[in-house]
Each structure stands twice: as C-alpha cells, then as structure tokens.
Amino acid sequence: SQKLRINFNGIGPYEFCPVVRRSPALERRGLEVLERLHTWAADPANAGLVDRVLNWAYLSETRDSYAIENETPAPDKERAFLQAMEQLRDRRPLSEDYLVDLQNLVITSAIKQELAFRHEQNWLQRGGHGALAVRYLPPPPAQVGELMDGLMRLANAREGDVPPLVKAALVSFGFVFVHPFMDGNGRLSRLLAQHSLSLQG
C-alpha cells in the first residue's frame, strides 16, 4: 500500500495468504529430494525407466487416493482418475473451468458432477447425526469465489521464493480448506499437489 507505505510480502495475494513457518532444515531436505529426483530423471541410463515409474506412480496414486476415501475404485473410476493425472502434464493454469473439468473426471456419478464452485454450505462429518458429527465446516459459499481466486493466483504464479514442495502443499491444503465442490475435494487436492510441482518444472 503506497498510502500506508507498507510492502506486502505475503505468500500469495491478499485473498489467499497462508502463513508458513520456514525451517532451514526442511527447506534443505526438500531441495535435496527434488535435486536427486531431477538428476535421476535426467540420466540417459534411466530413460526407459522414467515412463515405467510414472505409470506405476499414477496407478499407485489412483488406488491410494481412493483408499484414503475408504473406497475401492471400479475400473471406470480408476481410468478417470488416471486420465485426470495425465491432464496435469498439460501444465494448464488453474481456473474455475479447469477445476470443474477435473472434478467431472474424478467424480463419475453425473449427479455429483459440478458446473461451478459451490453455492451452498457443505461440511465433513463422521458417523452420527447433528452438529456433534461435523468435523469440518468449510468457509461459507459467499467467500468461496474470492478464496479460490486467491488460491488460483498463488498456484499459477511462476515467480517467487516459495520452495516447490512448500507451494505444492499450500495449494493442496488450501483447496481442501476452501472445499469449493460438494464432492471430490480430497481427490482433487492430491492432484493439485502434483499440478503445482509440474507448473514449477
């Protein structure tokens, strides 16, 4: 703000500005892991293995993602999730339309597929009924658009000094925090971590 002579140095825009406690040890470790992966993938001796490892990782991520939701995916759901993961290679910037497309891919039930971000309140609950069963109440629908605009601006920004693994975690967690759809948010959040890493190279 020029009026107040304050330099905003937050992670992300005002609409979505998470706070992260930085640790030199954690940052160092994250960079080491990324460097080792990059070195391995760039080695010509591993050229034939890269595709095999990616295919294994995609299949493993698909099954694990459904296991987190306590589901065993039917073959059509497995194929849909794999297709969504393969779309991440396109490195498209996040937008509401793109997220709706991804949600429609991972949610195979036409009744639960979305056309836009939610316009009603949702919540997560464990077994039981009533308010005591609610374990998370996402932001109200009136705030979803602004929060998602901020989150998408953070996700799409290619510059900045946020380490890639930290940014991927922020995008993934932020998506679950906002919970912009009535269904599929958990699966999409796991896809968005990978999307964030692919955008950052």
Regions found by a protein language model. Give the residues of each.
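FIC/Doc superfamily catalytic core
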Residues: 1-201
